[in-house]
Swiss-Prot record:
Membrane topology recorded in Swiss-Prot or TrEMBL: Peripheral membrane protein
Gene Ontology terms: biological process: hormone metabolic process; oxidative demethylation; progesterone metabolic process; steroid metabolic process
Protein name (record): Cytochrome P450 3A12
Source organism, top-level taxon: Eukaryota
Keywords: Endoplasmic reticulum, Heme, Iron, Membrane, Metal-binding, Microsome, Monooxygenase, Oxidoreductase
Broad EC category: oxidoreductase
Known catalytic reactions: an organic molecule + reduced [NADPH--hemoprotein reductase] + O2 = an alcohol + oxidized [NADPH--hemoprotein reductase] + H2O + H(+)
Induction line: P450 can be induced to high levels in liver and other tissues by various foreign compounds, including drugs, pesticides, and carcinogens.
Gene: CYP3A12
Cell location: Endoplasmic reticulum membrane; Microsome membrane
PROSITE patterns in alphabetical order: CYTOCHROME_P450 (PS00086)
Protein task: Cytochromes P450 are a group of heme-thiolate monooxygenases. In liver microsomes, this enzyme is involved in an NADPH-dependent electron transport pathway. It oxidizes a variety of structurally unrelated compounds, including steroids, fatty acids, and xenobiotics.
Length: 503
């Protein structure tokens, strides 16, 4: 029996041509970096170098940095990506040529109306969003929001007290995750939730569904490798952000906005109210003001960008304090001197705390919120003698940069003194990028820092943290997407003086 089908010569020829064309399509871009003399791993047809992500993005970046030096090229599917670590090149990409060449981030895939969110919008639409939203994050507005965050600092202390009284070790992600969710949902949607004690609340459930996001999920990976599938997914009504979840938040914002517009009394200052105010400002041209759907998109992206990052950063920081008790004690001494007798923190005093700033900065060096920064090259350009073709994604491997031993002696060590007044002036600002930099840096950076500092002060006024038998030492990272600990960070929590000052 013949194992080879009996096709005509024309059919075989057509099949051969189709296979050749398919191969050429899957490899067409893969010679770009070789022609430019830029080193990097060897790509495979269609998948490029994406199989190198098996152990995580940042493990891949560290290996490439070690093997190829300060610049290398690789391929996410057919997409050429140029990794740069030279501070001058980074400055050019993120600052100098931001508006002209490197304005946009890579397109994520089928995102629907979320395309108007400030993190995902492009070119003139992004500039418009940034202009509209920047006043929301001024010092004055953050001061007005400070009491809202403060009340959840009290909830955090009370929740920790209940757990500490049980005498059991505490999973930090549970308590800091609840704090982060409470603050974000309160400031973005105007709702008050004690999420740790009300896990069935619709806002809690939908926020957690929104954040079930894995960069190595087959759906996301298929978009990464085959971006041309995006229109197909849109036709099939398949979205990166779950439609049921975005519909829930859209209806919630519409309901909240309607309620606030009906009630003429003065409302508290939060992101939702500030965005509503911008819609109704007489100084704002109608075509420039936020539409209702754009307002919803910003509220959702605040949750997406702020929840996981804040809770994870706080967990990492507490781990470092628990394993460096001398640093923890020194920070508590600064807190006690700044706010005697467990006085409630104030915004102005918080921003003046030098050692608190040092500890937070060093934590964000070791565990940067954004392990990678990306910009798409809009036209052919030459930077520092390197030609970058149009369509190339230029990537700054922040995690790798922050652990470069030529910049940070003994980079794996936790040393807040790196950021002392004496030392921080010697740090090149383009080698320390936990929130990015330039016109398209994280718009919520100052809010996130304030949020974390307030939580740290309230917690350390009342508790000390110590390792226990469940604590993983040394800490191992799960680098699939956002940097996370491989296992939950579990610590023993002890009241400092036997009494806890809560709400």
């Amino acid at each position: 029996m013949d194992l080879i089908p009996s096709f005509s010569t024309e059919t075989w020829l057509l099949l051969a041509i189709s296979l050749v064309l398919l191969y050429l399509y899957g490899t067409y871009t893969h010679g770009i970096f070789r022609k430019l003399g830029i080193p990097g791993p060897t790509p495979l047809p269609f998948v490029g170098t994406a199989l190198g992500y098996r152990n995580g993005f940042y493990v891949f970046d560290m290996k490439c940095f070690s093997k190829y030096g300060r610049m290398w090229g690789f391929y996410d599917g057919r997409q050429p990506v140029l990794a740069i670590t030279d501070p001058d090149m980074i400055k050019t990409v993120l600052v100098k040529e931001c508006y002209s060449v490197f304005t946009n981030r890579r397109t994520l895939g089928p995102v629907g109306f979320m395309k108007s969110a400030i993190s995902l919008s492009e070119d003139e639409e992004w500039k418009r969003m940034r202009t509209l939203l920047s006043p929301t994050f001024t010092t004055g507005k953050l001061k007005e929001m400070f009491p809202i965050i403060g009340q959840y600092g009290d909830v955090l202390v009370n929740n920790l007290r209940k757990e500490a009284e049980k005498g059991k070790a505490i999973n930090l992600k549970d308590v800091f995750g609840a704090y982060s969710m409470d603050v974000i949902t309160s400031t973005s949607f105007g709702v008050n939730i004690d999420s740790l004690n009300h896990p069935q609340d619709p806002f809690v459930e939908n926020t957690k569904k929104l954040l079930k996001f894995d960069f190595l999920d087959p759906f996301f990976f298929s978009i990464l490798l085959f971006p041309f599938l995006t229109p197909v997914f849109e036709i099939l009504n398949i979205w990166l952000f779950p439609k049921k979840v975005t519909d829930f938040f859209r209806k919630s914002v519409e309901r909240m906005k309607e309620s606030r517009l009906k009630d003429k009394q003065k409302h508290r200052v939060d992101f939702l109210q500030l965005m509503i105010n911008s819609q109704n400002s007489k100084e704002m041209d109608t075509h420039k003001a936020l539409s209702d759907l754009e307002l919803v998109a910003q509220s959702i992206i605040f949750i997406f960008a702020g929840y996981e990052t804040t809770s994870t950063s706080l967990s990492f920081l507490m781990y470092e304090l628990a394993t460096h008790p001398d640093v923890q004690q020194k920070l508590q001494e600064e807190i006690d001197a700044t706010f005697p007798n467990k006085a409630l923190p104030t915004y102005d005093a918080l921003v003046q705390m030098e050692y608190l700033d040092m500890v937070l900065n060093e934590t964000l060096r070791l565990y940067p919120i954004a392990g990678r920064l990306e910009r798409v090259c809009k036209k052919d350009v030459e930077i520092s003698g390197v030609f970058i073709p149009k369509g190339t994604v230029v990537m700054v491997p922040t995690f790798t940069l922050h652990r470069d031993q030529s910049l940070w002696p003994e980079p794996e060590e936790f040393r807040p003194e790196r950021f002392s007044r004496k030392n921080k002036d010697s740090i090149n600002p383009y080698t320390y990028l936990p929130f990015g930099t330039g016109p398209r840096n994280c718009i919520g950076m100052r809010f996130a820092i304030m949020n974390m500092k307030l939580a740290l002060v309230r917690v350390l006024q009342n508790f000390s943290f110590k390792p226990c038998k469940e604590t993983q030492i040394p800490l191992k990272l799960n680098a699939q997407g956002i940097i996370q600990p491989e296992k939950p960070i579990v610590l023993k929590v002890e009241p400092r003086d036997g009494s806890v000052n809560g709400a």
